[in-house]
A protein has these predicted regions:
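A small/polar active-site loop signature that marks catalytic segments
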Residues: 81-226
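Active-site-adjacent loops and short helices of periplasmic peptidoglycan-processing enzymes
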Residues: 1-103, 114-148, 152-156
Length: 226
């Protein structure tokens, strides 16, 4: 499975919507490629200008982690570029954007302009039209690679994203609460003891989170012999 970020063009080809799928590793390079494909679609419709909106509805509930603002984690939103980092790092602490979704949309707008498309007005948040067609897609690295990066770098942003992807896959809302329910239920199915444990978030940064020695031992044993 890979997390998809898409660009959807309205039926009248007047509005382009950047739709976040929950990929915190989305890069400016990926947005450049998407902008090029979107520009091609607009030219096929004889359009050289477009309104730009951005859709973060994949996630619900609070955006700010309980410890936010904090250099260890960005606002948890379905759309961001490079984990909302304000520098060129890809791991460790860093100053974070207060509006990663809006920043991603503005970056996409700049790439559209470079591709020859005039973006009218400022990008605004709105859901994609139900009749809009997808004109560009970027897919993340496989989930296995995201898990490896999370564990190697202790990456809080990807950890939160993975928790929400679990929630989505299990029919829960992609929120802190939905992720908690999904993760807890999946551990129960694996017969991992969850008594006295509390998964307050996906990253473990919330001080209300608790795990027990029994849970950790059972989880490590299961991982060693799946």
């Amino acid at each position: 499975h890979r997390i998809a970020t898409t660009a959807a063009l309205s039926s009248d080809a007047r509005t382009l919507t950047l739709v976040g799928g929950g990929d915190p590793t989305l890069s400016e390079t990926a947005l450049r490629t998407m902008a090029g494909k979107a520009a091609e679609a607009l030219r096929e419709d004889d359009k050289d200008s477009v309104r730009l909106t951005y859709d973060t509805s994949r996630y619900t509930g609070p955006v700010l982690h309980p410890i936010s603002p904090n250099e260890n984690i960005a606002p948890v939103t379905a759309l961001m570029v490079n984990e909302g980092r304000l520098d060129d790092t890809d791991r460790g602490v860093a100053d974070r954007s207060e509006d990663p979704a809006g920043d991603a949309a503005r970056t996409f707008a700049a790439q559209l302009e470079k591709a020859g498309v005039k973006v009218t007005g400022e990008p605004r948040e709105a859901r994609a039209d139900d009749k809009a067609r997808t004109v560009a897609t970027h897919r993340s690295a496989p989930l296995s690679a995201l898990v490896e990066r999370t564990l190697t770098n202790s990456d809080n942003d990807i950890a939160e994203a993975l928790a929400r992807q679990t929630a989505i896959a299990k029919g829960e809302k992609a929120s802190f609460a939905g992720a908690r329910r999904a993760v807890t239920n999946e551990l129960k199915k694996l017969r991992i003891p969850v008594a006295d444990a509390h998964f307050a978030d996906g990253s473990g940064l919330d001080r209300k989170g608790r795990v027990t020695p029994a849970l950790l031992t059972a989880l490590l044993a299961r991982a060693a012999d799946p």
